[in-house]
């Protein structure tokens, strides 16, 4: 499982290396909005490689389960809910209100209940999870994971379909560093983040992963039934 973490952090390392190699000190650092695109792209590239080089349904199921539970659930759900929570906290402060630990607990629980509705039971203590998240002390950071993952999902699919030309285009994006705005960087990758289309397409891709996960499980269970 930690291989996905290693791939993620190497994505940051490769991004910063290329940006600093091709830009000056003042232009090298990219926008925070884009910062998690290269890291999550590495997770997607590794997963695609593992899937394309194995015929073992159990292994492929593990890879897809890892993508869904780590790459997508962690970045698309956990961090996005943290961003929603952070927004509500800032709205109170901007309106001249004050907060304390019980209030923060109340807000966190409200965000969880609003998102999950009646589908998931929110147990006692779930509202305390805001206490362990260092990203809250890094400015408006949590939302960048879902933003970056939307871009990397679209680009990784292009690499699968187009091959080397898409790879070369992505390397140019990484080399650009902070010389382009987030919208421009995404456009260089062929992704228009000014519309909701990339987000909807990414959600549809997650749905296709779930379908594949179910198909692999059915295949495994059918094989076991024959034994």
Predicted region positions:
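Conserved acidic
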Residues: 2, 30-34, 60, 100, ...
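Post-HExxH zinc-binding segment in Zn-dependent metallohydrolases
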Residues: 19, 29-59, 68-70, 74, ...
